[in-house]
């Protein structure tokens, strides 16, 4: 996959709920000319849960976005790797996203996230993060 990126929930939510960074993320994605988006099955739960809580009128948009994402199963190896990141101070859900991104690191150009701890941890793991802002 030549133009693939791992998408975490903090970024996915900005594609459903209008936030300050939304126009910059949308412009970056347009400049990438149809990037392939990959994420963990965890994104399904996190995104829909957040949309229902914060912006229920965005539910269809969330489903449309998820239809464009290639989802990875949360396998035992990913949970084992994630536990190591939790031990280093990352939250459980972010650790699962990082371990998932690491599992497909040879296929992706980077991790799209707006989570500061995940940006730091992905850098330590050797995965570049993409955080489009002004």
Segments predicted by a language model, with ranges:
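Short, well-structured N-terminal submotif of metal-dependent ribonuclease cores
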Residues: 1-39, 51-61, 126, 133-134
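Acidic, PIN/NYN-like endoribonuclease modules and their adjacent C-terminal/linker elements
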Residues: 2-4, 40, 44, 72, ...
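Acidic active-site catalytic centers that drive phospho-/nucleotidyl reactions
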Residues: 8, 94, 115
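Amphipathic alpha-helical segments within well-ordered protein domains
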Residues: 10-13, 48, 63, 83, ...
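Alpha-helix capping/helix-boundary segments
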Residues: 11-12, 43, 78, 97, ...
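A general structural signal for well-ordered alpha-helical segments in protein cores
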Residues: 22, 44, 48, 59-62, ...
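Acidic catalytic patch
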Residues: 67-88, 95-100
């Amino acid at each position: 996959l030549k133009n693939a990126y791992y998408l975490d929930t903090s970024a996915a939510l900005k594609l459903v709920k209008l936030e300050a960074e939304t126009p910059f993320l949308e412009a970056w994605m347009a400049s990438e000319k149809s990037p392939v988006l990959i994420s963990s099955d965890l994104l399904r739960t996190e995104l829909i849960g957040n949309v229902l809580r914060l912006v229920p009128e965005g539910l269809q948009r969330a489903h449309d976005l998820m239809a464009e994402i290639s989802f990875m199963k949360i396998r035992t190896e990913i949970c084992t790797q994630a536990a190591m990141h939790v031990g280093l101070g990352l939250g459980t859900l972010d650790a699962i996203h990082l371990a998932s991104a690491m599992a497909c690191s040879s296929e992706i150009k980077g991790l799209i996230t707006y989570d500061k701890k995940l940006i730091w941890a992905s850098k330590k793991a050797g995965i570049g993060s993409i955080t489009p802002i002004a």
